[in-house]
Each structure stands twice: as C-alpha cells, then as structure tokens.
Amino acid sequence: MANVQYYDVILKPVVTEKSMNAMAEKKYTFLVHPDANKTMIKEAVERMFEGTKVAKVNTMNCEGKNKRRGMVTGKTAKTKKAIVQLTADSKDIEIFAGL
C-alpha cells in the first residue's frame, strides 16, 4: 500500500445491531481498506479520534456474494472489517454518540 494516508484506511463505520451492542464493551466496527493491516488501523483510529487509545484490533476479510441479474451472474466487491477495542481509560468515539 504505497502512499495511503490514515483517513484512507478507515472507510466508514458499520452500523448494525450487533456492532451497536458491542459498543457497551468499547468495541467499534469499521469498514477498512482491503490492504490495511492492524497497525495501520490502530494508528488511523488514534489519529482520527482524539483521546482514544486502542487496546486491540481484530480484522476479517469478507468475500463478495454471488449475485444474478437475469442471465448475467457477477460478484459483489470483497470487503474488510475491523473491530477496534479501546482501553478502559480511553474516550468514546463521537460518531457513534447519537446512534
């Protein structure tokens, strides 16, 4: 990954019921760049959100699903998700505050 900035690593937050329940344990779920590694994700979260300290990062690669439109078959894009756990003394992430 040449020349990728920290704001290119985190694409968007994942807003599902499961990810909202995990926020009680200070675990936040993000869609990340497919080439990003755990150290890049940790650095990006700590830079983007002031006062946060990352305890650990879990990542998962999600394969694209097979889709069909008429006779034509294709695949949706592959994605990568990261579950970021913050330390106990860390501030909460503000983008999830109103949800």
From Swiss-Prot:
This is Large ribosomal subunit protein uL23. HAMAP family: Ribosomal_uL23_B. One of its GO terms (cellular component) is ribonucleoprotein complex. The keyword Acetylation does not apply. Coiled coil: none annotated. Keywords: Ribonucleoprotein, Ribosomal protein, RNA-binding, rRNA-binding. It comes from the Bacteria. Part of the 50S ribosomal subunit. Contacts protein L29, and trigger factor when it is bound to the ribosome. Belongs to the universal ribosomal protein uL23 family. One of the early assembly proteins it binds 23S rRNA. One of the proteins that surrounds the polypeptide exit tunnel on the outside of the ribosome. Forms the main docking site for trigger factor binding to the ribosome. One of its GO terms (molecular function) is structural constituent of ribosome. One of its GO terms (biological process) is translation.
